[in-house]
Amino acid sequence: LHHKRTHIEAPFANIGDVESLTIFDDCFVPYDRVFMCGRDHEGVARSAGYLALMSAHSHRHSYTGCKTAVSEVIASQAALVAEVNDIAKQSHVRDKLCDIIQTAELVFAAGQCSAYRSQKFPSGQQVPDEILTNAGRRLAGHNIYHEYETMADLTGGVCASLPPEENFFMEEDNVGELCNKYIVRNPAWSAENTHRVMRM
């Protein structure tokens, strides 16, 4: 459930990843644009399977660059959270950040190496090494949830128990004053900026 910000503007928090579903219902396709008519023919089925496999392979290879960037953003945000919580210099925190960075670099290296070891197919397409591509994709997919967990851990659980934004601005019963007082963990950071980081 998305709650619109009422006091602290955060335009980037309103941007999300969008996937699409394309439905061809009662759609005319000119015959010269039909490439796989005759599914009962053995060669067509084999070609269709290979086409799907190569499409997935290309996607997995692109993943080694895409998810690396996501991991770098998570590492940066986790480092910011650690600074706001005044724990950035703790060895266990540095270890956690190093784990995220290490995974990102290994995934990127797998993608680069798979491109370096690519083969040119008769069609002219340069196809990345399958083993290295799959290794990078698996490493990224396996560790991304650990990275989210690390970031949540570094917040000290505040990301799960942060009061609604309105509470930080309530005047009755000093609710806002108390929320702003107890959210601060590092005296170098204001209550508002701490709130912004934790809400991010």
Outline where the language-model segments fall:
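Active/binding-pocket-proximal capping segment
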Residues: S114-G124, S161, E165-F169
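Alpha-helix capping/hinge segments and adjacent helical runs
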Residues: I131-M200
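FAD-binding core of flavoproteins
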Residues: L1-C66
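Short, charged, amphipathic alpha-helical segments
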Residues: R94-C98, Q126-N134
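Extended amphipathic alpha-helical segments enriched in small hydrophobics
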Residues: S62-F121
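Short, well-ordered loop/turn and helix-capping segments at boundaries between secondary-structure elements
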Residues: V29-P30, T103, H146, D153
